[in-house]
């Protein structure tokens, strides 16, 4: 994804990348988010990992970053199920949940 593709999207569109980080130009994504070319984005991967603290994407309030956890496979499916069950039990007991996104920090 690059600037031309972002500008061809509807301004109400949300971009999600859980695939390969190098398929998205981060500076172009930051520009698209900042100038309103798209409504928002969520990325689990980036061409540079971890995303540098000074990168412009961290200033985009319409972005959510997850720590490269979107994956596929029997091992990850089992772990995902464990986390869901554990968080459900924690919720019932009134305990803090694991892996909660801090909406203020957007990750």
Where does each model-flagged region fall?
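Beta-loop-alpha module in the N-terminal Rossmann-like domain of NAD(P)-dependent dehydrogenases
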Residues: 1-4, 22-24
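A short, gly/pro- and small-residue-rich
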Residues: 2-5, 84-86
């Amino acid at each position: 994804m690059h600037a031309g593709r972002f500008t061809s999207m509807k301004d109400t569109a949300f971009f999600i990348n859980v695939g390969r980080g190098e398929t998205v130009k981060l500076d172009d994504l930051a520009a698209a988010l900042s100038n309103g070319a798209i409504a928002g984005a969520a990325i689990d991967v980036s061409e540079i990992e971890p995303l540098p603290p000074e990168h412009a994407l961290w200033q985009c309030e319409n972005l959510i970053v997850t720590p490269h956890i979107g994956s596929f496979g029997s091992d990850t499916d089992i772990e995902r199920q464990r986390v869901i069950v554990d968080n459900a039990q924690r919720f019932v007991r009134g305990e803090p949940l694991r892996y909660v996104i801090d909406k203020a920090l957007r990750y």
